[in-house]
Amino acid sequence: MKKIDWDNLEYYDFVGIVAGIAALIYALYVGTLWYVTYDYRIETRDQMIETYQQLSDPIHSIKDDYGIHQKMLIYFVSGTRTFERDLTDDELEWYGEQLLSRGWKIDKKYTRIDRSRKSTSISLSKGEFACSIHRWDGEKKCSFFLIKRDWIYDKGF
């Protein structure tokens, strides 16, 4: 095996060594967080499922299709609820007010038209939980997105 000549080390060799060490440190950091926070993350996942299931329907739903997803160390819930008919803006507004009585706070409401389709959205928060509800005109469904903004979320994982 050839020894490294540290006095005549080329620039790209040095960059490669530094990048390799940085990647190793990052992998050790994420791996340690993964191992240490496992129980906390599983508990958070279960809390999010329970919180999503406690969100009532604005009108009677036919189908509730949701899933728990993971991005690195963060879990989030996304779901679609299908209704018997199209949900109106007034019903979505009433639904937001109904969630206010359950401790949720409305952060933002907005309506936009994209490709001649109108969509209405409500962003809510309750403690560390954040939820977005979207509905489109002409469709008999709403999409829900729920995430917990805790210290792991703040770290960017």
Describe each region flagged by the PLM.
Residues 2-157:
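An acidic-aromatic pocket/loop used at catalytic or ligand-binding sites
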